[in-house]
């Protein structure tokens, strides 16, 4: 048996408590890296979209509460931008779902809360891009499901993904109809 004086033991105990506190306060390791990288991919894509928009004369500030698509501009760029953004955002939501599932048994409330915080933060630039009530979708889902549990995070992610898929489909179909007048709703549902 290893002999240990009180001071060493107390220091080891403090260190163990500190490490446990740090772990319980948020995401760590590969999970943190994956989710933060995925969230950054969204902001990078939105920045690229806004840069492209400026070059094409599209004014995102012209968005109104209910007019955030082709009603604001005849230019299909806005529709394309939303399709691009929702594609990247859905990858982020899938990453959240996978990581929450991995941590279902061993994760802490701090880790799940950090996942929710990331989802909420990511919803802001998506909303500024014209995806209506994205932050409300995420926060409303958190009111119905505890964001400090794996199941709560999975339910919030599900609501977020459903919203993204609806927006993606709507904008994709509208874009295809503008490109090809023979493109029907039925064809859209099958794509």
From Swiss-Prot:
Belongs to the decorin-binding protein family. Residues 1-29 form the signal peptide. Binds to decorin which may mediate the adherence of B.burgdorferi to collagen fibers in skin and other tissues. It comes from the Bacteria. InterPro entries: Decorin-bd, Decorin-db_sf, Decorin_bind_prot_A. The lineage of its organism: Bacteria, Pseudomonadati, Spirochaetota, Spirochaetia, Spirochaetales. Pfam families: Decorin_bind. The gene is dbpA. This is Decorin-binding protein A. One of its GO terms (cellular component) is membrane. Disulfide bonds: none annotated. Keywords: Plasmid, Signal.
């Amino acid at each position: 048996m290893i002999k240990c004086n009180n001071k060493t033991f107390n220091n080891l105990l403090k260190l163990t408590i500190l490490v446990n506190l740090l772990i319980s306060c948020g995401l760590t390791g590969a999970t943190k890296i994956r989710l933060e990288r995925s969230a950054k991919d969204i902001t990078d894509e939105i920045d690229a979209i806004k840069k492209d928009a400026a070059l094409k004369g599209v004014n995102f500030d012209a968005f109104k509460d209910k007019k955030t698509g082709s009603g604001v501009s005849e230019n299909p760029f806005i529709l394309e931008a939303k399709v691009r953004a929702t594609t990247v955002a859905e990858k982020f939501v899938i990453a959240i779902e996978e990581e929450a599932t991995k941590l279902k048994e061993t994760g802490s409330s701090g880790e799940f809360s950090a996942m929710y915080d990331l989802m909420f933060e990511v919803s802001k630039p998506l909303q500024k891009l014209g995806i209506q009530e994205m932050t409300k979708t995420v926060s409303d889902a958190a009111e119905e499901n505890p964001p400090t549990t794996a199941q709560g995070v999975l339910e919030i992610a599900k609501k977020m993904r459903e919203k993204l898929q609806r927006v993606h489909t709507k904008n994709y179909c509208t874009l295809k109809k503008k490109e090809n007048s023979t493109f029907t709703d039925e064809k859209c549902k099958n794509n």
